């Protein structure tokens, strides 16, 4: 029905593009007028636009003229003129939508249109890329255009100082990676002084490779962590225990099947991606750890460590999920195949894998701050994105980010030939067919790019090609350092490249070879340093004679190699262009489309074909049993391909099932994080008020009133007579911490006259008196500074503890689904109570610390920043303006507000 509707009326994207075309006509009509302007007149358009904005015109009013200005400036500065379809893409991005543009259609240039227009407001535009290389390249390259038009450009990459970051964010346009933007937001909400904040308000972001960032990475939260203080011994013991167990692996475990009857100690369910102990395994665990009952809440820690060891051994595969390099376990990105340095699995899984691999088990980290990309990017006032493949995920973009997807027509028609899938009975037959296809292409000089899903498979194919004497390049997580260079040359005559499905994303494969990378390689051979080569091929202005000489050499080499690659290009085109071979269908159709999209860029010829076996994970876990049975009944040879419409439909249906499951997982992550996000917003808003200089005296007095109320409600029974109240509790809770000793010692006559309201007033008056005495002792200015620092430190410490508690709660409530309770509703209810309790604890700690503080003016500290590195060490900063007055127990919280125990903080030398 939908297809019939689209035939008559066109698709949603067709209708949207048609609606935008009148705007494009207006832009194109302005071209002669813009071409007639001098450089100075063209530059003067920027202040003119800003003035018109201030006088009431809108960005939409300015759009046609502003886009025409950018188009002409780009022609003069970069030598590139925006095509009509690129103007359409620019309008879509300005409207806060996702523009799906095929590989090679010039997304980088398209972004300049909405970036310039929105930067005119002076509130900052963020251009988000997937890695530092692309952020640097695009900021330098497109920066020439923006600078020509009078706009400033900043760059956020790893390793910058706070001052450098602040300067970059204050620019009109800021390029950077999703990780850097997210981490800076978290760090800004951990500072003690407002001037240490680096970001401005989140105004407008354009996200490049938007599907990768907002969907593929949506399940992974950004976490700033410090080193925890828990021992790692239990991970080693749990690993030793799991090694003794007998395992049984199921493709899919029938719910009705009694796991108790299985002759194994633990079972792995591949489809559900779980590893669990059987009754036999539980019994062995209790014997090994010397405990009565593994399910007892007291044994939760042991149970957790065993579960992570089971996951490490049963589910996590070396050279697929992670690699071991330089005695470290490094995660492999499941989508790009890249090594993710600095990233660690959470909840102790990383430590369990370290124990499994026999490398040093690092201490578990403590989360200081975290946020998901979903919630970070939803904070922007306007958000848009670009990618080559978004349409298959349109439902998710709409429901979670309120973004619709518009497919932008290509400048030249796509002439790539996408062959139907070749399906084989087993993996051996499939790989033999792949090798035969490569040999056939290689004979005529047609370049081949083979996409694999794991290191193991790429190395297997490599060994098969070696046996047939076919020279080739392998690109996987182990050899990713030269990723861009290897991918760039994948279009050379006769080239054969094996790569993970999404490797080298952002690098164009040019038929005949890439002269830029060839020139760089030659410069390395001639002894040029890497930093000089980067400067020589970059776009920054310079007067450095060494770099100017290097640029001259580079230009000469580039021109020489360009002649060679242009001649070779003709031969590659004659051979059929780049041939893409997929060796397995990915869980997501989008990733398959990305692999296909590497060929046929800008009207180039090309071919693609996927080779599939019934032993592939997707078919094994999600293909229908009826289909598998039918294929078995045919009794085909392993080298005989199966081609049938039913089979193609089954593959697509399997992918749709997995996509739906993964969408449900991401949606579940968001449901839980939305609860946390509301609490995060409250805490961060409170912090910002403090940082912005709000007078805290009223807040502190209000806290004292709340504490007095809490004490009376907690210890005074319903009976109005004081004899029935818990005086021991009242005194131990209140005296020393909030009021001087003896304050609550009443005579018999006073007791007779006492009621709850009078007791509350006595406690409050005593706290207020002590507070006023402190202010006289310190002076108002120092008192306000003390209040500010103490409040921020206590809030940060309690928030960190709350994050841990919420994490534990989230894991715990999931089990309640078995009791027919909605885990999300349970989580919301209990997390609210925990948040209220955290706020009470913040108030009581802040008041207690302030009332018991003595300032030693000779030990006033220098100001320190809170969270410089990604893995921030928390608790060392601004902790010594305060030292104890009363004797503090060594295991009590330090009164300085650091959140550490006294013996590990100010009492460390005692």
From Swiss-Prot:
Molecular-function GO terms, alphabetical: ATP binding; metal ion binding; protein-exporting ATPase activity
Enzyme Commission code: 7.4.2.8
Which GO terms of the cellular component aspect does the record hold?
cell envelope Sec protein transport complex; cytosol; plasma membrane
Reactions catalysed, semicolon-separated, are: ATP + H2O + cellular proteinSide 1 = ADP + phosphate + cellular proteinSide 2
Biological process per Gene Ontology, one example term: protein transport by the Sec complex
- How the protein sits in the membrane? Peripheral membrane protein
- Determine if ATP-binding is one of this entry's keywords: yes
* SMART domains per the UniProt record, alphabetical: SecA_DEAD (SM00957), SecA_PP_bind (SM00958)
| Entry keywords, A to Z | ATP-binding, Cell membrane, Cytoplasm, Membrane, Metal-binding, Nucleotide-binding, Protein transport, Translocase, Translocation, Transport, Zinc
The Swiss-Prot or TrEMBL record describes its family as follows:
Belongs to the SecA family.
Output this protein's name: Protein translocase subunit SecA
Q: Which species is the source of this protein?
A: Acetivibrio thermocellus (strain ATCC 27405 / DSM 1237 / JCM 9322 / NBRC 103400 / NCIMB 10682 / NRRL B-4536 / VPI 7372)
């Amino acid at each position: 029905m939908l297809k019939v509707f689209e035939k008559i009326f066109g698709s949603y994207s067709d209708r949207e593009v048609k609606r935008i075309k009148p705007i494009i006509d207006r832009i194109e009509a302005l071209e002669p007028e813009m071409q007639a302007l001098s450089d100075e007149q063209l530059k003067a358009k920027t202040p003119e636009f800003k003035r018109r904005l201030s006088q009431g015109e809108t960005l939409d009013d300015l759009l046609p003229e502003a886009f025409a200005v950018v188009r002409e400036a780009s022609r003069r500065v970069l030598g590139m003129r925006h095509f009509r379809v690129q103007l359409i893409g620019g309008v879509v991005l300005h409207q806060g939508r996702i523009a799906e543009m095929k590989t090679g259609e010039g997304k980088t240039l398209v972004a300049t249109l909405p970036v310039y227009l929105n930067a005119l407001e002076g509130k900052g535009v963020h251009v988000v890329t997937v890695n530092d290389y692309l952020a640097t390249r695009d900021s330098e390259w497109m920066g020439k255009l923006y600078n020509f038009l009078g706009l400033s450009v900043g760059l956020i990459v790893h390793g910058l100082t706070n001052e450098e970051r602040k300067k970059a964010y204050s620019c009109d346009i800021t390029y950077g990676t999703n990780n850097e933007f997210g981490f800076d937001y978290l760090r800004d909400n951990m500072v003690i002084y407002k001037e240490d904040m680096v970001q401005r308000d989140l105004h407008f972001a354009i996200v490049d490779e938007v599907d990768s960032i907002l969907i593929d990475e949506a399940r992974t939260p950004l976490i700033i962590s410090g080193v925890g203080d828990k021992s790692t011994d239990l991970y080693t013991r749990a690993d030793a225990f799991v090694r003794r167990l007998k395992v049984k692996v199921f493709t899919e475990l029938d719910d009705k099947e009694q796991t108790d009857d299985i002759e194994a100690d633990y079972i792995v369910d591949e489809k559900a991606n779980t590893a669990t102990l059987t009754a036999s395994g539980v019994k062995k665990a209790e014997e090994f750890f010397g405990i009565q009952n593994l399910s007892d809440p007291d044994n939760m820690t042991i149970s957790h460590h065993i579960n992570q060891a089971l996951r490490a051994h049963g589910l996590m595969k070396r050279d697929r999920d992670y690699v071991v390099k330089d005695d470290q376990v490094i995660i492999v990105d499941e989508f790009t195949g890249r090594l993710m340095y600095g990233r660690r699995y959470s909840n102790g899984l990383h430590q369990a894998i370290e124990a499994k691999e026999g490398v040093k088990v690092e201490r578990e980290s403590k989360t200081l701050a975290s946020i998901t990309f979903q919630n970070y990017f939803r904070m922007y006032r306007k958000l848009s994105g670009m990618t080559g493949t978004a349409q298959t995920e349109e439902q998710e973009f709409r429901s979670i980010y309120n973004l619709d997807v518009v497919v932008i027509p290509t400048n030249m028609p796509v002439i790539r030939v996408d062959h139907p899938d070749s399906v084989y009975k087993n993996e051996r037959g499939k790989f033999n067919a792949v090798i035969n296809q490569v040999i056939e292409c290689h004979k005529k000089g047609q370049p081949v790019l083979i996409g694999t899903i794991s290191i193991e498979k790429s190395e297997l194919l490599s060994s098969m090609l070696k046996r047939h004497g076919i020279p080739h390049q392998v690109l996987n997580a182990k050899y990713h350092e030269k990723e861009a260079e290897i991918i760039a040359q994948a279009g050379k005559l006769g080239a054969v490249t094996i790569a993970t499905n999404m490797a080298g994303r952002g690098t164009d494969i040019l038929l005949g070879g890439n002269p830029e990378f060839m020139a760089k390689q030659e410069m390395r051979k001639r002894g040029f340093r890497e930093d000089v080569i980067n400067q020589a091929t970059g776009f920054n202005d310079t007067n450095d004679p060494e770099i100017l000489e290097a640029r001259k050499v580079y230009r000469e080499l580039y021109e020489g190699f360009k002649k060679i690659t242009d001649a070779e290009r003709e031969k590659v085109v004659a051979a059929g262009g780049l041939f893409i071979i997929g060796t397995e269908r990915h869980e997501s159709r989008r990733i398959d489309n990305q692999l296909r999209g590497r060929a046929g860029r800008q009207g180039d010829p090309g071919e693609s074909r996927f080779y599939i076996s019934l032993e592939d994970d997707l078919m094994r876990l999600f293909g229908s049993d009826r289909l598998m049975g039918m294929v078995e009944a045919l009794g085909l040879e392993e080298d005989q391909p199966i081609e049938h419409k039913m089979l193609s439909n089954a593959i697509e249906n399997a992918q749709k099932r997995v996509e739906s499951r993964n969408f449900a997982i991401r949606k579940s992550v968001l449901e839980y994080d939305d609860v946390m996000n509301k609490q995060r917003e409250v805490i961060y808003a409170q912090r910002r008020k403090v940082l912005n200089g709000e007078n805290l005296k009223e807040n502190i007095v209000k806290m004292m009133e709340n504490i007095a109320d809490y004490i009376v409600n907690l210890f005074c029974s319903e009976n109005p007579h004081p004899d029935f109240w818990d005086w021991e509790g009242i005194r131990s809770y209140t005296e020393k911490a909030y009021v001087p000793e003896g304050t609550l010692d009443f005579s018999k006559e006073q007791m007779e006259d006492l009621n709850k309201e009078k007791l509350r007033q006595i406690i409050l008056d005593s706290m207020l008196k002590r507070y006023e005495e402190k202010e006289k002792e310190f002076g108002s200015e120092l008192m306000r500074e003390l209040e500010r620092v103490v409040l921020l430190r206590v809030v940060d410490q309690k928030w960190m503890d709350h994050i841990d508690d919420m994490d534990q709660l989230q894991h715990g409530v999931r089990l309640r689904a078995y009791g027919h309770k909605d885990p999300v509703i349970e989580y919301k209810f209990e997390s609210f109570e925990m948040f209220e309790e955290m706020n009470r604890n913040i108030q009581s700690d802040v008041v207690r610390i302030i009332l018991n503080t003595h300032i030693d003016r000779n030990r006033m500290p220098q100001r320190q920043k809170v969270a410089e590195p990604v893995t921030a060490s928390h608790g060392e900063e601004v902790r010594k303006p305060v030292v104890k007055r009363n004797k503090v127990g060594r295991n009590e919280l330090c009164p300085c507000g650091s959140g550490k125990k006294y013996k590990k903080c100010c009492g460390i030398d005692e």
